[in-house]
């Protein structure tokens, strides 16, 4: 009954546009530059209480509402970040795609629709998908290849927690791999997963993918990532997810201190990942 009630609330929240975004900065480790952010959807009820994303996102997927959630995310990214992205062509915002977004191809159409006339360039909107989105491998490969041809970079998110990671990675048209926080947490511990982290990094580099470490919280983790030559990271060591205005301030201060992203980040497609049978 409680889940049914929450489902009804979510439908109302989507209709009333109560969902909003926070932005977690993504940092280039060699330079300290803020190259962009990951857009993270949030839901605050009218009474001020927050509903956790790990509750309402799976519910939206189960109830067939995830497409509407993704539409709102895309619309809000364009609205929130238009001024920043037009002013700083080296910056990008990453949006998360659900399995339905990939199988339907709707997210790509909605992104193109909302970007039209905004001044935002396709390479400034990155698309991220978890391994759960690749159940239909052929469809996923087609949609992600279309996204890359349109100018978007594509990343696999939360890598390492899926059921067939290695098999899928070689078959998908990707630009970047984001290592799941659980593997970053294992750095320097006796965890059974700790030997997996360097293997993931090496595998990504062999395939020519950028590596983004998620959930970085300690200086020890950061030092390890430097030694492994991981390019990018995000996590509370750098910043919590921020409301739009706070992220703009964060990005501006970081830019004043470290500068803008290097030329290769301004056009990710300048480093294409071409593999036989993929594109």
Positions of predicted regions on the chain:
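Amphipathic, coiled-coil-like alpha-helical segments
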Residues: 128, 147, 272-279
């Amino acid at each position: 009954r409680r889940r049914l009630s929450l489902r009804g609330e979510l439908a109302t929240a989507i209709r009333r546009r109560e969902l909003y975004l926070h932005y977690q900065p993504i940092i280039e480790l060699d330079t300290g530059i803020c190259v962009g952010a990951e857009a993270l959807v949030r839901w605050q009820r009218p009474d001020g209480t927050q509903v956790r994303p790990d509750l309402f996102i799976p519910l939206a997927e189960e109830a067939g509402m995830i497409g509407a959630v993704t539409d709102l995310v895309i619309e809000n990214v364009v609205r929130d970040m238009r001024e920043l992205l037009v002013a700083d062509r080296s910056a990008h915002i990453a949006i998360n795609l659900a399995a339905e977004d990939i199988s339907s191809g709707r997210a790509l159409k909605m992104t193109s629709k909302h970007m039209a006339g905004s001044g935002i360039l396709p390479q400034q909107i990155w698309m991220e998908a978890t391994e759960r989105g690749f159940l239909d491998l052929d469809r996923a490969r087609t949609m992600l290849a279309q996204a890359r041809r349109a100018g978007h970079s594509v990343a696999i998110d939360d890598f390492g927690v899926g059921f067939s990671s290695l098999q899928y990675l070689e078959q998908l048209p990707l630009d970047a791999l984001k290592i799941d926080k659980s593997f970053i947490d294992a750095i320097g511990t006796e965890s059974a997963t700790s030997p997996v982290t360097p293997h993931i990094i090496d595998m990504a580099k062999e395939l020519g993918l950028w590596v983004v470490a998620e959930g970085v919280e300690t200086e020890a983790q950061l030092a390890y990532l430097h030694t492994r030559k991981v390019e990018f990271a995000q996590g509370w060591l750098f910043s919590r997810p921020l409301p739009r205005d706070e992220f703009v301030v964060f990005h501006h201060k970081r830019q004043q201190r470290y500068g803008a992203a290097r030329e290769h980040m301004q056009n990710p497609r300048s480093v294409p990942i071409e593999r036989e049978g993929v594109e």
